[in-house]
C-alpha cells in the first residue's frame, strides 16, 4: 500500500452513481468481505455528517432562475407571431398547436438545463440541489416544477393543452393554471393506484415462468455464440455493458496473437483492450462471440458459463444459484418502482424537440456560406443546413466569440446579421427520438363567429359522404367565414333600409325581432315547391336549363306552408339534402289537380294492374266473358304484389305492411278454413276477408249471416301519416332514405282506378256508442256523444284492447235472385244492366259489389253494393311541356321520363285528416339513363345569397365520375408586371380562369334564375354577345407591356367584367360607418370611365346587378328586403379608380394587413361592392385547411358561433412514460400483438417458418428454420423490452431478460405435415427435446416455432404442481390425473408446495455428482480467473471507466438496429 500513498487526493462530492462505481471497484480489488467493512464505515460517516449538518429546507432555498423572465418572454413573442399567422390564415390549427407545443417544450427544457448549472454555480451546498441531484429525494423534473416552470399539460383525453403553465410552484399558480394542472395530477393518482397492482402481477408471472431455472452444471458444452460488435451502431458504453460479465464462446485474436481464450469471462480490462483494438482498426476487427442463456443446451436449467458472472460479485455465478427468480424480480421490481413515480404531467409531450444554440452576446454573426445551403425548417421557415461541423463567429464590441455547430444542424440567421444576446441562432437535430409510437388524432375546428361559409378551391363531394354534408379537401385551401348575422322580421312587408345600406348596429336591440332563423333553414320540411304552378296547364317557360350534365331548377320555399301537410299545386321535389340519383330514381313529382279527392274524407282505392309483359285484354268480348274478366281485373291479386325488394348498400327497406293472415287469426281466434276453401275456388286473397268483429259463436249470426267487408289490417300509423309517406313499395318503388327508385321489371300500368267512400272512427275504449254493429244509418247520425257520421251506410264495430274502431261503409244491401251469379269483390261498369238485379234503370256510376259470406237467410241471398267514383288514367305527358326549349339552343340531353303512379295501396283504407285534400295519382319525373345503374347523379340544394336575397337552387349533376366537385373560381392568372407595393394576386378576374376552360366545356353549369323569396322576381337576362364586352384591365398607360389578347374561344359566359358588367354609379360614403346612405341613382345606358378609355354597354333599367361566384346573374329589387343580413362592412378609400382595377375585383378575398394602396387593410374579408373611389369589404375570417381535411357544411351555408367547421386528422407522438411503458413490457412478454410492436413478432415468426424450409428443403428445413426463427425473435424481443426500460433510465442487465425470453420462446409446436409416432400434431414440446427425439428415432419430426406468452408458458411446464398453484387449479389437476403425469419436483415451487428441501443453495449439492475430470477443469479455470483478476489494476479502472456524467447515460440507448446478430456454427 506504500505506493498508493502517493496517489492524488480526490476532493469532490460523490453521488449515487459514483457510489455504485466505487463499490464495484472495491469488490473487484478487495473482495466481498473487506468491502462490506468499508461500506459499514461509509454508512457511519454518512449518518454522522447528516446529524452534524442537519439539512433543513426553507422557502429561501428554492432559488429562482434569473433567465426565466426573458425565456418566457421570448416564447410568448413566438406564440404571438404564431397566433397572428393563424389569424391571417397562413397556418392551420394543427400546425399552430404543434408549433406552440414545441416552443413551450423547448423553453421548459432549456430552463431545466439552466436550473442545473445555476444551482451548481451559485450554491452547490443548497439542500434542494443536494437532495435531488444526489438521488436521495426528488428528481430533476420535480425541482424544475418547484423553481422553473411547470410547462405543458395534457387534458384527460391525453391531448396537449397548448396553454402552458408559466409559473412554478414557488411563485404560485393562477386559477386557470391550477385547473389545467389538476388533470395530470388526477391521472397520476389513478395511474399509481391501478398500475401498482399491475406491476405486482407482472412480477408474479415473471417469477412463475422461470422459478425452476437454476445453475446446475459447470458447462453444457455448446459451441454456439452470439456475435457482438460495435459496428452495428452500438455505442461503446452499451458495448462495454453487454460484454462485461459474459463468457467468450470463441478465442479472440488481434493479428496472430490470441488475447482471450474460449470460456474465459470478460472483465473491464479485456473490454478496454477490445475497444482500443476496434478504434485502431474499425473494419478489420473480428466480431466477439459470447455465450448467453440463449445458447445454453440444457432444457430446464442453465450452466455457469452460459450465465456468466454473478451480478453481486465479480466471479462466475455459483452452482445452485436460483438465477430464474433473480431474473424475474430484477425485471418486475423497476416496474413497481416506476409506477410509484407518478409523472408530473400525466402523459405529456416528451422528447423529440431540437436543442437550440443561443448567441453568447450581442454582435455580428459570420460563417462560411459555402458550407451551408438553403432549406426550410419543418415549419416552413427559411434556414440554412450545414453538412459538416461549422464554426460561427460572433463579433461583439471587444470580444470575438466562436460557437461550434454540429453537422446536420439548421442555422436560423443569415450571414453578417446582427444578433442579440441569447437569440436562437441554430437548431441541433435531435438524435433518434424515443417516440416511435404514433397515434392518429382528430381535431375539430369550430367557428368563432356567425356568418356564411365560403371556400376557395375545389371541394370534393366524397362518395362515402353522399348523404351527409361532409366534403373532403383535395388540396390545401382556405375556408372563409363571412361575418354577418341573420335578422329576420316576422312580416317581410316593409323595411326602412334599402339594399346595400349601412345599418346602425345598435338599432336591432331596440325592437323585438322574431327569430325564425333556425327553423327556416332550407331543410325545413323536406319538400320544396316550384313556383310555377301552371306548368302543366299551358306551356309556360320553366327556366330550368337543361344541360348535358347538370340542370338547375329554381325552388321556392314558402314559410306559411309549413303548417300544411299537403303540398300545393305544382312540382314538388323530394330529394335528400345530398342525395344520389341513380337510374330510375324519382326526383320530382307533380300532383295533378284532377286526381284530387274532395275534402269530405276517406275511402278505398281499387284498381287492377296490367303488367307490361301481359297482353292487354280488350273489353270487346261477350257479356259473360266480360263478367269474368271484370272480376279478374278488379280483384286484388296478391301474387302480383309480392315483388322482390332490392337490397343494396343502403340496407333493405323496412317492410311496414305486414301480411295479414297471421295477425287476424291470432287476434280473433276464429277458424277460417271453410272460408279459405271458397277463396281458393275464386282465386281471391286473404286480404279480401276479415273475420267478423263479434264473437263468431253468437247464434244470431248463424241465423241471419253476417257481412264480411274487404279490409286490410289496420296499421295504427296509417291514419296519421301524411300522404307523401304512403307512396308504396308495392308498385316497385323502393325507398332509400328519401330517394325512391323504380324497378322496371315489376312496373305495372293502371288504366283506371276507383274510389269508394268509407269512413273510420277510432274511439276510446270507454266511449259509449249510439249505433249498433251491423246496422245501417243515414248521413249525420250521432255515433257517440260528440261525433257524427259524414256518410250513410253500414256500420261495423271492432273492439280492440286499447280502442274501438267504428267503420261506416257507404252503400246499400241488394238482394240478388241467385247466389251463383253474383261474385263478390268485383266492380260493375255503369252501362251494363245487372241480369239478376231487380233494378232495371241504368246507373250513372260504377258500383262495387262488396265481398260477402253467402249465408242463406230465409232463402234470400244478399250482397252489399257500394257506389264508386272512377278516375281514368291518361298517358304520361310529353316532356316538352315540362321544360321549354333551351334558350341557348342546346340539344336536349336530360333523360327524364314521366311515370304516373297511384299513391294508395289497393283495397287499403285511406284515412286522412279531415278538411285536407288528398291526392290519388302522382306524376313522377324519373331519371332515365340508357346504361345500367353505374351512373349516379348527385343532387344538392345550393343556397345562394347575394347580399340580401336568399335563393335556393336544386342542382343535379349528372356526371360520369363518382366524385363531383364544385369549382370556385379564384385561380390566379396574373399577367404583366406588378409594382412592389401591390398585392401579388394581380388582376384575377374571378369569373375567368384559363385553366378551367377545357373542363368547363365538358361540365357546363347552368345559369338559373335566382328567385326572390317574397314571391316577386326579376326575369333572368341571358346576355348575348352584343350585350357585354370585356373590360381591359391593363389599358391604362402605366403598364404598357401588359396588354392581354382576348382569347376568342372563350364562351360568352366567361367574359363578364370584374364587376359583372354592371358598374354602379358613385355613391358618397361618408367616413362615419353607421350613416345610412342610399344607392338611388339609376345607371345611365352608357357609362364612360375616363381612366379606362373604354365605353361599355350596361343593361338598362336595372338598379343594381351582380354576378356572384357561380357566375349567376342576380338583380336586386332594392325596395323589398326580406331577410337583411347585417353585414359587418369596412370601407377602404383609395385615390383613383385606375390604380385599383389592376388589383381588385369583385368577390376577391383579401387578408388583413395587406398593403393594397397607401393605407393597410384593417380587416380581412371579401370585396363585395366596388365604387369609383372606394370599395366595401365584408369582414371575413380565413381558416387554412390541409389536404384530406373534412369540411362540414355547404357552400354559402349559415354557420353559428361554435358550429364545427373542419375536422383535421393528424398524427401525434404518444408519450412513452412508464405508465404506458409498463403495459408495453407486459404485452411483449405476453406475446400479444399490439400496434406499437413495430414489426409484429408473431407475423415475423410465421414468415420465417414458411420461408426457410422452402429454401433449404424439408428434413433439415424445419430444424434450422425453427432455430433461426427463435434466435431472431429472441434478440428482437430483448431489444424491445430494454428500449422501454432505458427510455425511463432504468438499467437492467440483458441476461435477466434473456432468461425469461428463453422460456417464452423455447417451445415448438408439432405440425401436421409429417406424422411421427412420438408426438401428436399440435403438441407443444421443447425445441431441444424435439431435436433429440428426431436424432434418436432417425426420422424427421416436423415442427414450427411458436411464441408463447409468459402466462401460457407458466401453464406449459414439466411440473403440474407448479402449474396448478398458478392458475386454473382444477383444470390442471384433472388433466394431469387423466394423463397420469409425473412431477419430478425439479423446481423450487413444487418443493415449497410439498414442503421439501428446495434444490438451490445448500440443498443443491446432493443432486450433483462431479466426475474427477470435471473437477480438474474447474480448478484450471479458477487459476485462470485468479490470474486475470490480479492483472487488473485498480487505478486503471478508475481513470478508464466512462465518465460519471448522468446526462450522457441517457443518450446511449437509442440504438435502432438490434445489437446482436446471431451466428451458428453447425
Curated annotation (Swiss-Prot):
Function field: DNA-dependent RNA polymerase catalyzes the transcription of DNA into RNA using the four ribonucleoside triphosphates as substrates.
The protein, known as: DNA-directed RNA polymerase subunit beta''
Entry GO terms, CC: chloroplast; DNA-directed RNA polymerase complex; mitochondrion
Enzyme Commission number(s) from the entry: 2.7.7.6
Biological processes annotated in GO: DNA-templated transcription
Keyword terms, alphabetized: Chloroplast, DNA-directed RNA polymerase, Metal-binding, Nucleotidyltransferase, Plastid, Transcription, Transferase, Zinc
Subcellular location, record wording: Plastid, Chloroplast
Catalytic activity: RNA(n) + a ribonucleoside 5'-triphosphate = RNA(n+1) + diphosphate
Assembly information from the UniProt record: In plastids the minimal PEP RNA polymerase catalytic core is composed of four subunits: alpha, beta, beta', and beta''. When a (nuclear-encoded) sigma factor is associated with the core the holoenzyme is formed, which can initiate transcription.
Main location, first listed in the record: plastid
Enzyme class, first EC level, given as a word: transferase
InterPro entries linked: DNA-dir_RpoC2_beta_pp, RNA_pol_beta''_euk, RNA_pol_Rpb1_3_sf, RNA_pol_Rpb1_4, RNA_pol_Rpb1_5, Rpb1_funnel_sf
Residues covered by region (Disordered): 618-725
Cofactor binding, note field: Binds 1 Zn(2+) ion per subunit.
Comp. bias intervals (Acidic residues): 621-631, 639-651, 707-725
Record-linked SUPFAM superfamilies: beta and beta-prime subunits of DNA dependent RNA-polymerase
PANTHER family hit by this protein: DNA-DIRECTED RNA POLYMERASE SUBUNIT BETA (PTHR34995:SF1)
Cofactor(s), by name: Zn(2+)
UniProt-recorded Gene Ontology molecular function terms: DNA binding; DNA-directed RNA polymerase activity; zinc ion binding
